[in-house]
């Protein structure tokens, strides 16, 4: 199984000729706008969203297109499990029934957090997907799950923003590998130096798209390998 992270052109996805899993961790332009092109050009069976997005204009456009293309819309919340195939399933950890109020509209605070389990030959590899969650959501996850958050690989929240990746959350996840999806020379200052330091403090190996380009993770029965478009010098 291969998982390709971050922004990819539709043409590239088609060229790879392999199955993909698409979900909108939150319906904001930097997370979901590309879904329209995906749905228009690729045969998509299901799209996974969370209920907090229902008031978004972009969400409404995506839903309209899904109905036109007969794409099944799965709205998820904490406690659900989604089986992809005999090897892979996702456990939805967030959001819960009650939406978190972060004073900023709640988009980040209520983004989908999902833990992926890939089991091949009795060996399970786990990846934590975090959307743009920030401190308030991380605190809730730590309170509910504690050490059950542990994962082999972490998709770092909010592009490495200083408002995310708190020490308590990272301690519970304790990832061997961290993936940061971030644009080169971005104006936000992502990833934050404090976030990088906290990851280094727990001996996590960091992969960044601004430094390495496209990141591909391949999980097989023997090992988990990571390839990048730009090689480390």
Feature locations, PLM:
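Non-globular, low-confidence helical/coil segments that flank catalytic cores
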Residues: 1-233
